[in-house]
């Protein structure tokens, strides 16, 4: 479908590229962001990519809605480039599965008629696309989880989920960047800080990155935890065809 542009209040617009969660749609959104950034337009306050749309906040004293639409329409309708040599960023997230770190691993396994080892193997066998950021600072909305481990949310959310907890809700998976309430099924925990305001880029991940969960043991967890912000996760740069899980 052709992108549709619509106003959001008096100083923002939404560009909708589709109505389904799809990596190609999300790639088009990211390419649109890059194209707009290359213009260095004064008055663009912020661009927020979502699953299927791009929200652009702008200075209403600089542009009218109609003026901005005239600038953006040619960019939004240009064909998406299909560079097969493009390298994608894959960030390894070391994770302890099960036990006190993943109290719901057993339920996820039994719900799907699998062993706990099966769940760990399936969950860590896919590279997950970061579609967008939201909910709380540093939280990533990931796509690509294998439906074989899909599990409903908890019927009663917990009042406290520790930072770094890795969870499953429906066909989604993700990592809690900070302590918070939550209703996801917790299957593990990472010692890596997903959000740290002392870093130049506070959030470890950004839209367009891929996450690769790597199983570790409890000893490795505590070693990495002690390193704190000095620990640097392993980062791979791979072609699309080399992603795990084929997503």
What residues fall within each predicted segment?
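Glycine-rich active-site loops that engage anionic ligands at enzyme catalytic sites
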Residues: 1-247
């Amino acid at each position: 479908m052709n992108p549709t542009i619509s106003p959001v209040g008096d100083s923002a617009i939404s560009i909708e590229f589709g109505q389904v969660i799809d990596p190609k749609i999300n790639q088009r959104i990211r390419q649109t962001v890059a194209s707009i950034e290359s213009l260095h337009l004064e008055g663009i306050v912020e661009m927020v990519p979502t699953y299927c749309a791009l929200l652009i906040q702008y200075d209403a004293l600089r542009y009218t809605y109609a003026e901005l639409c005239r600038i953006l329409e040619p960019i939004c309708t240009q064909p998406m480039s299909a560079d097969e040599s493009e390298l994608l960023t894959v960030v390894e997230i070391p994770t302890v599965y099960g036990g006190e770190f993943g109290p719901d691993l057993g339920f996820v396994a039994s719900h799907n008629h699998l062993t706990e080892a099966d769940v760990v193997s399936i969950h860590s066998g896919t590279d997950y696309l970061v579609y967008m950021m939201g909910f709380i600072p540093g939280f990533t909305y990931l796509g690509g989880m294998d439906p074989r481990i899909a599990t409903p949310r908890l019927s009663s959310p917990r009042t406290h989920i520790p930072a770094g907890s890795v969870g499953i809700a429906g066909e989604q998976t993700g990592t809690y960047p900070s302590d918070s309430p939550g209703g996801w099924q917790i299957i593990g925990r990472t010692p890596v800080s997903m959000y740290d305001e002392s870093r130049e880029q506070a959030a470890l991940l950004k839209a367009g990155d891929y996450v690769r969960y790597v199983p570790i043991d409890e000893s490795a967890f505590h070693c990495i935890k002690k390193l704190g912000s000095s620990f640097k996760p392993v980062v791979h740069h791979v072609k699309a065809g080399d992603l795990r899980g084929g997503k």
